[in-house]
Amino acid sequence: MRYAATILFVALTGCSGPQTDAKMQSLYENKKEYFSALVTGADCHIEKNKILWRHEVTKSNTACLELLAKVEADGIGVDPISEGIMVFPSSRNYSSHRKGYIFSAKALTPLYPSLDEHPAGLQPYQMGFKKIDEKWYITYEYAN
């Protein structure tokens, strides 16, 4: 019985879902220089329609991978819809709700005041956004 309780606890903590907006915004604000370096510096060479994952270590992407570690992210890539740069936070959960960061020169919609709960009217695989800084957004996607 004791083992069943432990397994249930581990299963539930693994399905806790993404971080809150407040935690994500705080991380962004505390590490803003590293987030900016990811998208504006010469260290990250991101191919369109491809994600650079932190475990893909080569000499040419070492500096970019160090920046990803500093912002607690697992990957970076170009979002094909907004053409912005998407930063994928490290997540150790199995939730159907995904959150991330996106840097976009274009204004992104739909905007929501909070992404802590599933936004009303947002369809599966459609992204919702919360603006946290000039050209920076938190993204939310429900992956049915």
Model-derived features with residue positions:
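Residue-level detector of functional hotspots within protein domains
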Residues: 1, 21, 122
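Sec-dependent bacterial lipoprotein signal peptides
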Residues: 1-13
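Alpha-helical interaction segments
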Residues: 5, 24-25, 126-127
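Generic detector of low-complexity/intrinsically disordered segments
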Residues: 10-14, 40, 110-113, 117
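N-terminal export/targeting and maturation segments
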Residues: 15-77
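Extracytoplasmic electrostatic interaction patches
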Residues: 74-144
